[in-house]
């Protein structure tokens, strides 16, 4: 065991080699403004669609990534994780968004990138240092994954 940094682009390769059934990329945001707060979850933007941050489509939106093969499942896991965070933490909920993050583009399994809060927000930074809050975060994420799995079992 070692603590080695793996680049965002490499993380999908690690998941693919492991033949992962699901990929959950957890992050904490930071912003220039100390008032920014809340959590948000991202699914890979489908081909020909504009991302949340750039709502006007461009020619780059026509590119298809390996991860786009999982579009329905990407959306489903993103929904269930965000819903579980709302139920477990309350908010503020910044919502479900679409982006072409490098960590999601080349996944061969469903994937989601979740921003768990802003460490530049004093109250959030304080909460994150608390083991009880981190346990609450972990439980919420677990609940979201379980809800996703149950939904898959009903569909298949």
Annotate each predicted stretch with a short phrase.
Residues 1-156:
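Active-site-proximal helix/loop segments of hydrolytic enzymes
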């Amino acid at each position: 065991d070692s603590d080695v940094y793996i680049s965002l682009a490499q993380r999908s390769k690690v998941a693919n080699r492991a033949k992962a059934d699901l990929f959950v990329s957890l992050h904490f945001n930071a912003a220039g403004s100390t008032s920014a707060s809340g959590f948000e979850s991202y699914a890979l933007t489908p081909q020909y669609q504009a991302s949340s941050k750039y709502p006007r489509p461009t020619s780059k939106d026509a590119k298809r990534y390996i991860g786009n093969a999982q579009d329905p499942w990407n959306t489903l896991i993103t929904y269930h994780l965000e819903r579980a965070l709302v139920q477990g933490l309350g908010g503020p909920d910044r919502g479900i968004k679409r982006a072409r993050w490098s960590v999601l583009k080349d996944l061969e399994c469903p994937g989601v990138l979740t921003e768990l809060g802003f460490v530049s927000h004093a109250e959030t930074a304080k909460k994150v240092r608390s083991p009880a809050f981190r346990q609450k975060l972990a439980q919420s994420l677990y609940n979201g994954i379980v809800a996703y799995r149950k939904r898959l079992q009903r569909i298949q």
